[in-house]
Every structure is written in structure tokens, then in C-alpha cells.
Amino acid sequence: MKTVVHDLGKEQNENLLASADRVVFADGRYAPCQGCFRCWTKHPAACAMKDELHQACRVLGAADDLTIITENLYGSYSPAVKNLLDRSIGTSTPFSTYRGRQMHHTLRYGRHDLWKVIVYGEITEAEKATFRYMAERNAINDGFERSEVRFLENLSELEGWL
């Protein structure tokens, strides 16, 4: 299943659905992760906070290809997208395993194919390097086989990268 997470605005959902099975709009109106770990222990893969991100773990966990469209913020995801990713920690379990000679959490949903990040907005070369490294590490942590990062000068280029 191909899933797109974005912060572009709700009006973009219809356009993005043409190239994805599932679209999640990170509008920034959700409570941040409280670090209670109930999504790991008490209610596996379901957030204890009952809002629209309650099932985010299951939606992102089912994605074979995950595309994240985000505005650059100092070489990182926008706050709304970061909040959504934080709330999806339940895609893994509290147990640990070695992957590639590194310790990582055991995956609840198994391996995935592509973690793609499409970044828009002003960005420096240093921020690009930070973003590439972070996306690669996020992909490994969440069990994706590979990662890609694309930087757009303006949003009119977006359609060709989905």
C-alpha cells in the first residue's frame, strides 16, 4: 500500500489520492506524543489519545511505500509532520533486535520498501545533508529497505515525484 503524509493543506488530499492508496494530512491540530508508551504496551499500535491520529501506527505500519511531503524547518520535518511521526512509534515494539549490526526496536508490521521524503521551502546545503541523514536513519528505524529525499524549488514540481 502506498501512503502519503503531507502538510500541504486539506485541499491537496484529492490530488494526492490519485497517486496513493492512503493520504494523511498533518494539519498540526493534534496533541503531541505524551511518551506514555501505551501504544507499545497496553494498546499495541493504537495511541491512547483518541483523536484523528489514534490509528496512525496502523496506517503507517501498513505502508509498503511511505511518501512524506514536508516543509523544511532547519533541516527537519515541519512540526505537524514531526508530531504525526512521533505519534506513530507503535509501529515498532518495545523489544530490541540487531539489524545491520545496530540495535533497533523489533518491527510490529515487518519490512517495507520505500521511505521517500519530498521537501519544499528554502533550504541550505547543510540542511539538505541533515535531512538526507535523518531520512536514512528514520527509514532504517521503521524497517524500510531504502530511502529517498527530493528537494523541490517550488511545489509545481511535486507531481513528477509522486
Spans of model-derived segments:
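Structural motif
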Residues: 5-10, 120-123, 152-153
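A generic local structural motif
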Residues: 52-55, 101-105
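Short, conserved loop/helix-junction motifs that constitute active-site signature segments
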Residues: 106-114
